[in-house]
Structures are given as C-alpha cells and as structure tokens.
Amino acid sequence: METFRIHFFKEKSRHVDIDLLLNYFRDEPHVETEMDETSVRFKYEHPTIFLGYQYTITPRSTVPDIYRLSPNYLDVNIHIDLPILMNRYVFQQFLKSMDRFCKAFKLHPYHPLFEDVMPFKYELLSVVYHMVQSKYIQKHHEEMQSYVFLDEKVAYKMFKYEDDILELKSYYQDVSVFVPKYQLLYDGVQLIKAIEIIDGIQTVIPPEIDTIFIRLKDQSLFAYDYQKIEKKVAPLLTKVPGTIEGTHVVLKKVSNKFYKIVKKAPIKSIDTAFKSIRSRQILEREGSNDIS
C-alpha cells in the first residue's frame, strides 16, 4: 500500500538536535526506534486500532523538486509516512501528534501538492490527504473490496470507543467489569457490529452494536439481534462517564434481567460468507452509499 509522505523543513537552518530528537521519541508512548546505515526510523502503532506512522531521518534529502521551493526553508532530511487508507478519526489524532512534533523542533511541513513549504495547518493537510486518498480509492478497486464505508458519525463513535478501551479497562479493573472489543464481520455488502461476552458477567456495551454473541456455561455461542431489544434493555444500562455517547455498562444488580431480555431476542444465523475484519478497515464517506 502507498503512504502519504510529509517532509519537514526549518527556516534558515538545517540543525535539529539529534539527542533531543531521540529523547522526544523515547518519551512518546508505543514508539519503537530502529536504525541502520541508511536511516533512523521511529515507528508508532496505535495499541487498539492498529494503525501507525513512521518518522524517518535520512542522510540526504528525499524531497522531489526541492529546487523549486523557497530558499528561506531548508530540508532537515526528516519525513513522516502515514497510511493512505486511514479513517478520519485516527488521521486527526496523528495530525495532533505531528503538530506537537513541528512545534517542538520549529519545523514546517511540505507535501508536493503544496505550493511551497507552509506553516502547520490542520485544514490544508486534511484537504490534501483526503484528495490523495480519494484518488487512491478510485484506482484500487480490488484492494477496496476488503474495506467498509460507514457513516462518519457512526464511525467516530466506534473509533472513539476503541481509542478509550485501555482507559476503560483500567477504570473498571477493580470492579470486574468486562470491556469488550468490537467483533466486526463483513460479507462484502453488510457489516455486523458485534461484541462477544460471557453469560451473566458485568460488561460495558459499546456504541453502535447490532449483535451480541453470548457464550453460555456449556461453551455454546449464540448471536442475538441486539437491535430488536435495545429499547427494552435501555433502562437497565448505566452511562459510562467520560467517554463517547452511547457507551454503557451492565452492572451486577441488573445483569440477570439484562441477560434474560437479550436471550429472548431473535437468534441470528451468521452466513459463512461473513469474514472477520479489523476496525482499521473502516473508512468514512458521506453520502447515500454509506452503511449505517
């Protein structure tokens, strides 16, 4: 897969303190450092969404057509590569990280679609990224068969929940509340947004799910249509503080009643055409073709 590359420049200087740079990335969570005779690489991967980026320091410039750019800005031989197929939620998180990096070392970003080296601007970077992404999607139909396009608001809630999972697990660890990940199943047309839980446990219920897999004591597993009973169980759910709207928890005092209602919902038959996908295969697109 292609990447979206941003180069970094500095005004009237090429100097970047390497020790400060190494310490900067050493203090960044989930970043690994690699180096050899060709480059130094700082690799980040989101711990629950599994999308990442890579900063690279090279011995010489890799900027195309550098001589057409303003001489007031000098290439510091650092660039970042981002996945070209990335949802807007994670892209915005990565932009915030890039903004911090630019401010820390007084850098200015550049992409070949820019007129010149520019100050960091969220809107400009977002417009150019999504322009490049759109062209990539149009050209790679076969690759896109494994991706799902969701309504932007639905996708935002799902990614915000996944982004919060580790904090939720820490918040609930002392009271034995299970924090499930999404189980996503896709057959090329329909997306099933599910969770799998054990019968009777206290659990968080993420936003936007339509199916609950319940594993019974005999280890059998049933898929229940959550949408059919969502309104019935709503009074039993407690809103989880400090996270995205639609995130609730089933507490012990109501768990028996909750599971009785869920197990009266229609049982879904999941066709073998459905395959498991990860949330990183979800993209947002406005319009009538979106899956809600």
Describe every region a protein language model picked out.
Residues 123-228:
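Aromatic/basic-lined ligand-recognition segments
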Residues 93-100, 104-119, 186, 193-221, ...:
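Amphipathic alpha-helical protein-interaction segments
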Residues 37-41, 71-169:
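Internal, hydrophobic cores of structured domains that mediate oligomerization or house catalytic pockets
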Residues 227-292:
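Extended, charged low-complexity segments
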Residues 27-31, 104, 134, 168-171, ...:
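Surface-exposed polar/charged interaction patches
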Residues 15-20, 123, 225, 258, ...:
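Secondary-structure junction/capping motif
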Residues 23-88, 214, 219-235, 239:
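Short, intrinsically disordered low-complexity segments
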Residues 1-50, 148-150, 154-161, 289-292:
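Short, extreme N-terminal segment that most often corresponds to the first beta-strand
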